[in-house]
Amino acid sequence: MAKETFYITTPIYYPSGNLHIGHAYSTVAGDVIARYKRMQGYDVRYLTGTDEHGQKIQEKAQKAGKTEIEYLDEMIAGIKQLWAKLEISNDDFIRTTEERHKHVVEQVFERLLKQGDIYLGEYEGWYSVPDETYYTESQLVDPQYENGKIIGGKSPDSGHEVELVKEESYFFNISKYTDRLLEFYDQNPDFIQPPSRKNEMINNFIKPGLADLAVSRTSFNWGVHVPSNPKHVVYVWIDALVNYISALGYLSDDESLFNKYWPADIHLMAKEIVRFHSIIWPILLMALDLPLPKKVFAHGWILMKDGKMSKSKGNVVDPNILIDRYGLDATRYYLMRELPFGSDGVFTPEAFVERTNFDLANDLGNLVNRTISMVNKYFDGELPAYQGPLHELDEEMEAMALETVKSYTESMESLQFSVALSTVWKFISRTNKYIDETTPWVLAKDDSQKDMLGNVMAHLVENIRYAAVLLRPFLTHAPKEIFEQLNINNPQFMEFSSLEQYGVLTESIMVTGQPKPIFPRLDSEAEIAYIKESMQPPATEEEKEEIPSKPQIDIKDFDKVEIKAATIINAEHVKKSDKLLKIQVDLDSEQRQIVSGIAKFYTPDDIIGKKVAVVTNLKPAKLMGQKSEGMILSAEKDGVLTLVSLPSAIPNGAVIK
């Protein structure tokens, strides 16, 4: 029997700068849902990706002296590295520059044009380049006037300056779908979540009247061009939103994924783009005569004490820093526990450290440590088999375990992650109290209480197993470590279905000889200071410390170094090393193997096909037993390493001078 499918998407991110913890928040939330649904037995499809067209990308690439795709490839490599670091379990990563996407955008646009939903006209409006959005005069923030006429203002979404733009444009006649959209809302009251977002869409956008939407631009050319009128570039409303179906092969030669997974079960996004997903996207699907997604969920923002994150304010949180110093589980746990999903939440270093110390190190970590230590002390490491409840406290714990699963499930289904985790921690806290109430150290002194003592240990381990299973969608390492230390190696006992009946450990097991701390306790004062320091804005030009220069060399010394262009044709990880990649490069006249310490910044797939600069006259060396015949040039700044990429037009073997 085929599994029931579940299709979840994040927004596709705009790669015009480094991602911060707010982007990680959306993607981790999607990952939690995907992992939870897989545990429930669903056939899950989890999609994320990048929105790579538009004026801002074109300008960023030009400023960097690169082609758009060269600029994008570098940015996307960083995004994929962050997702890998967060252990995001996405099944696909869609880039809007891919042919599979471009093909769908072209066909969708021409179809809507042919059936009269799109028409050619002229547009004049206030435009924000960073937001890629037009605004009416009434929507502008801090409008500027001259002789009673608006001459400028700021975007209501980002606060960026807007400019008056007038150009020929294709328009999407969305106004004719207004009644049909409202009828859909009535028939599907849970379509937009939380409910407050639905009221906002109806009262602020639909009731005042939907204006037809400009869906093409002529003022830039980086994007998908309209096939029948190539001077027009398809605008973001169609280009970006269509990714959810282009990634499934819609209108391709193989629509099997589309037929299997569409409509989406959940579109997940931050609240500032819910309008596009709850109004424009449903209308676009109606025009294409396609089923609408089942739910659009708009979560809140991660705020700082002084408002939204901003590099200039010095309050941007880099998830890489948190993961590197405190581990992935602590970072994922904080995001899903501290911040109520659907509402805005405030990030503070103090709360991050407190959650790590109190919840993870004290409550969970100490429970595991105490339990394993007692099994070793009282039973030489052999956990007695579960016998059933021998005491009313046992009965209470068993009932609470089953009730915890029920409450947890209800919270997870409504995407109330912080509530689900709170439910688990109440159970963990109650289990810690169970130790104090049953007093194993007293029972151990009375041989007649041996069975009772063994059953207390069995209940403790079973409770820990329940908690570990429920935490699997959130924490990617701790549950595995718990199962290993308890020597629970039956995969069935790690699945959600094993929680339907309490007491599956009906045979004795040998726990680990010495428990290992899963979450080391942090020095609160030092770590709070560290996080605050990491959030400081970059130094101004006047404040930047001068990087010490190396001794000057003569041109003859530099001429000794031979640097050539090469293409990376293959790459793989070096065994037993988390830093090294073994790379094959094509220098035209020969192929060489180079071992490079870039594995923390690039995967093999990220670099295959890249044109790079290679120092070719270094003496061969051996690294981890692998021969290395050269060095690939890279740049390093603030601990982040980036390969020096060359334009593809430079032939392999060309000497760089």
From Swiss-Prot:
Motif 'KMSKS' region in this chain: 308-312
Subcellular location: Cytoplasm
Keyword Endoplasmic reticulum: no
UniProt keyword terms in alphabetical order: Aminoacyl-tRNA synthetase, ATP-binding, Cytoplasm, Ligase, Nucleotide-binding, Protein biosynthesis, RNA-binding, tRNA-binding
Assembly behavior: Homodimer.
Family: Belongs to the class-I aminoacyl-tRNA synthetase family. MetG type 2B subfamily.
Protein's name according to its UniProt entry: Methionine--tRNA ligase
Organism, scientific name: Staphylococcus aureus (strain MSSA476)
Gene name for this UniProt entry: metG
